[in-house]
Amino acid sequence: MKTIPLTLETEALARRFVWFEPPEEALSDTDRFVAYALARATHADMMLLRRFLMDDDLREALDRAPPGIIDPRSWAYWNSVLGRYPAPAMPVRRFG
């Protein structure tokens, strides 16, 4: 997966999507950051991120998404947009 550089624009996105940690930390884990983006980004936000990420990067982020970040509606939408229909099973949290 490609890294997303820290710019003024990506810093603003990181502050909105992953508000509970510094932007540098949020962007350091690309798969996790993209999972938050897939759940929370607007169309304009995704246009910005698509400057750095291709379809394969988004598919990879979906495959590696931590459980509990992407809601079912966003999961179905992004898998469909990326040519995966029906969508694979969502990530599941495991305890113990």
Predicted regions and their residues:
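Long, compositionally biased intrinsically disordered regulatory segments in eukaryotic proteins
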Residues: 1-96
